[in-house]
């Protein structure tokens, strides 16, 4: 089976991309264990706790990221540069445990995957 990477690069709640990506990730996890999740650019906002999507009439899907462990999805990476650019600290408690990587290391890790799906 091919190695699959899911890359979240958009902010939550502005579009359905994050929710659709999470749904695809959970569905794919039933078919393979060889996958990983990457949070880059505005996608790092997907990791923040305490969001209030109901204020913009959006569905609260962010809490579903907490289920990644139950689906045996353990390879989660977050771009350290993206965190800094957005004023976020890598020590921030995120909804899922994601390992911060600098951009070069993140690119090298991403190169290990055969299929890259971006949301």
Swiss-Prot record:
Keywords recorded for this protein, A-Z: Cytoplasm, tRNA processing
Subcellular location: Cytoplasm
Signal sequence range: none
Gene Ontology CC terms, in alphabetical order: cytoplasm
Keyword hit for Chloroplast: no
GO biological process, alphabetically ordered: tRNA processing
Subunit structure: Heterohexamer, formed by a dimer of trimers. The hexameric TusBCD complex contains 2 copies each of TusB, TusC and TusD. The TusBCD complex interacts with TusE.
Family stated for the protein in its record: Belongs to the DsrF/TusC family.
Function (record text): Part of a sulfur-relay system required for 2-thiolation of 5-methylaminomethyl-2-thiouridine (mnm(5)s(2)U) at tRNA wobble positions.
Annotated HAMAP family: Thiourid_synth_C
NCBIfam families per UniProt: PRK00211.1 (NF001238), sulf_tusC_dsrF (TIGR03010)
Name assigned to this protein: Protein TusC
Lineage per the UniProt record: Bacteria, Pseudomonadati, Pseudomonadota, Gammaproteobacteria, Enterobacterales
Gene expressing this chain: tusC
